[in-house]
């Protein structure tokens, strides 16, 4: 099979007319085209490599053939198989098959098909988050980070940006639901397993971290940020959704449920980006009670890995700066806060120091 696929690939390489004719026929005739999606599912890296090279050679630099692929039943089957392979190989990104699969998905995204692929795979997955959708988001996130610094990626049109904005809200709501179920712990084991499937929870968490990071990146591309995307986030009430997510994370016992730590870091970063030079968002986060939640992130938590805990604190300080800048109402909230106690940390004890609160200020003295 590998030799036969390679032979077809050799015949079509450099033959644009032949590639176009054959590709259209494969996409039109499900019986013929399905052969190649089935080859992608074979447990043989050589066969998979030859098949991916064939697919990439057919669609490379062809907007028309990419369009045909994402809309054809045969093409969708190929995409499912390719994304499955990417998921299987994601821990070995130097693998040649991973590179080929990435190149195919990347080519389709370049022609503006991210949303089409996402919706198609979602529809074939009972609208559940899964590894294929997560890998699709990972490819998009990787492409955005690899793009020229300070410039908006030209493969992100209105449809793609709107989809990303909607995913932030959708995945926040799903994650909050999951965390509430964990916190309450009131359902029977059978009910929990039916509602909170482990794989589903894992994929929601991974996808949400990615989509929060992607959104923050788009908002901080340059001094002005992505103004169109920001308005979409505002329209989707993402500030409220992310604040609710952060609030829910605060209620979790981080020592027992450490898996949600990264959500706090990326939530704070996005909230800070939304409030940057925007009086509407500054006022909104005050009105929904978000300022104390942001302030609470300035401490370093023992449950967090050290570097991520520090990053969380830095993002929280930056977010507070954006929230308080030229906003007297927000500044007044901070001014009204009074210190209650000085926390004695293990590090201070080891250094022989004791923290005391004197006239509202923290003082250190020898223990």
Question: What are the residue ranges of the model-derived segments?
Answer:
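Eukaryote-biased recognition of C-terminal alpha-helical segments
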Residues: 43, 54, 315-322, 338-367
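Elongated alpha-helical scaffolds that mediate protein-protein interactions in large eukaryotic proteins
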Residues: 1-37, 41-50, 57-77, 89-99, ...
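Extended HEAT/HEAT-like alpha-solenoid repeat tracts in very large eukaryotic scaffold/adaptor proteins
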Residues: 1-8, 47, 51-55, 97-105, ...
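Amphipathic alpha-helical segments within extended alpha-helical solenoids and repeat-rich scaffolds
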Residues: 28-43, 73-89, 114-136, 153-195, ...
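Eukaryotic scaffolding regions of large macromolecular assemblies
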Residues: 208, 215-336, 345
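Sequence-level detector for tyrosine residue identity
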Residues: 36, 102, 111, 118, ...
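Long, compositionally biased, phosphorylation-prone intrinsically disordered terminal regions
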Residues: 40, 110, 145, 150, ...
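Short inter-helical turns and helix N-cap capping residues of alpha-solenoid HEAT/ARM repeat scaffolds
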Residues: 43-44, 90, 94, 204, ...
